[in-house]
């Protein structure tokens, strides 16, 4: 899975480098080439967005405990993408203004002032859009962190539950072992008691036999 992600990363790096180079060349190109270059950059930006989507899908399939590094890289790539789109918008505004100036020609100071005002309004709108995009990216990053934290918490709870079950099973085995040891101890005590009793009986029997033999010998001697 990480190999696919790294492949998308390499494609994204090459593509964004080409886009950056082309955006910087737009202002210096002749009108016909500018139009073609703008269309080409739009196509490549769409390809870059698709690569980001593929990379995002790959990151979502990574286990939560290993996802943090990839999520940070994704946030960096999305910020880079946002900057490219902003630079391209500014380049398009400059290109549109240039085309309009060529069409209008020398329409007078009034038209020029209106164009300047329109350019300022567009720049202001672009700044607001950029701020909204940054806020959206921060919210998305915060949401991803919250989701990852929740998943990690769930895994920790599951691990704790498994550990608790293992500890309980170990305690049960210890109780069973203690019970078995108690039974074994009682059995050994009973066996020792019977052995001692048997030895005492043997000693008593031995004494009785000896006394009987001695008595018989005594009577035998006296009879002769």
Curated annotation (Swiss-Prot):
The keyword Protein transport applies. One of its GO terms (cellular component) is cytosol. V-SNARE that mediates vesicle transport pathways through interactions with t-SNAREs on the target membrane. These interactions are proposed to mediate aspects of the specificity of vesicle trafficking and to promote fusion of the lipid bilayers. Involved in vesicular transport from the late endosomes to the trans-Golgi network. Along with VAMP7, involved in an non-conventional RAB1-dependent traffic route to the cell surface used by KCNIP1 and KCND2. May be concerned with increased secretion of cytokines associated with cellular senescence. The keyword Membrane applies. This is Vesicle transport through interaction with t-SNAREs homolog 1A. Interacts with distinct SNARE complexes that contain either STX5 or STX6. Interacts with NAPA and, to a lesser extent, with NAPG. Identified in a complex containing STX6, STX12, VAMP4 and VTI1A. InterPro entries: GOSR2/Membrin/Bos1 (IPR027027), SNARE (IPR010989), T_SNARE_dom (IPR000727), v-SNARE_N_sf (IPR038407), Vesicle_trsprt_v-SNARE_N (IPR007705). Keywords: Coiled coil, Cytoplasmic vesicle, Golgi apparatus, Membrane, Protein transport, Synapse, Transmembrane, Transmembrane helix, Transport. It comes from Rattus norvegicus. Belongs to the VTI1 family. GO terms for biological process: autophagy; endocytic recycling; endoplasmic reticulum to Golgi vesicle-mediated transport; Golgi to vacuole transport; intra-Golgi vesicle-mediated transport; intracellular protein transport; macroautophagy; retrograde transport, endosome to Golgi. The chain crosses the membrane at residues 200-220. Residues 1-199 are cytoplasmic. Specifically expressed in the neuronal tissues cerebellum, cortex and hippocampus. Isoform 1/VTI1A is expressed in the same neuronal tissues but also in lung, liver, kidney and spleen. It is a single-pass type IV membrane protein. It is found in: Membrane; Cytoplasmic vesicle, Secretory vesicle, Synaptic vesicle membrane; Cytoplasmic vesicle, Clathrin-coated vesicle membrane; Golgi apparatus membrane. Residues 221-224 are vesicular. Disulfide bonds: none annotated. Residues 31-92, 106-185 form a coiled coil. GO terms for molecular function: SNAP receptor activity; SNARE binding. It comes from the Eukaryota.
């Amino acid at each position: 899975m990480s190999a696919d992600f790294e492949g998308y990363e390499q494609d994204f790096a090459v593509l964004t480098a080409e886009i950056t180079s082309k955006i910087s060349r737009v202002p210096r190109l002749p009108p016909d080439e500018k139009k073609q270059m703008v269309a080409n950059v739009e196509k490549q930006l769409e390809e870059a967005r698709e690569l980001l989507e593929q990379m995002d899908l790959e990151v979502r399939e990574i286990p939560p405990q290993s996802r943090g590094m990839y999520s940070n890289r994704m946030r960096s790539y999305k910020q880079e993408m946002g900057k490219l789109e902003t630079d391209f918008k500014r380049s398009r505004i400059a290109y549109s203004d240039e085309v309009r100036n060529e069409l209008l020609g020398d329409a007078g100071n009034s038209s020029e002032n209106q164009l300047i005002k329109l350019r300022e309004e567009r720049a202001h709108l672009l700044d607001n859009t950029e701020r909204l995009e940054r806020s959206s990216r921060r919210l998305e990053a915060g949401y991803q962190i919250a989701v990852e934290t929740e998943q990690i918490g769930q895994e920790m709870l599951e691990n704790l539950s498994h550990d608790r079950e293992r500890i309980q099973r170990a305690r049960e085995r210890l109780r069973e072992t203690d019970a078995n040891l108690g039974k074994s101890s009682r059995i050994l005590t009973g066996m020792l008691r019977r052995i001692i009793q048997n030895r005492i009986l043997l000693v008593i029997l031995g004494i009785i036999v000896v006394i009987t033999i001695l008595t018989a010998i005594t009577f035998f001697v006296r009879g002769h």
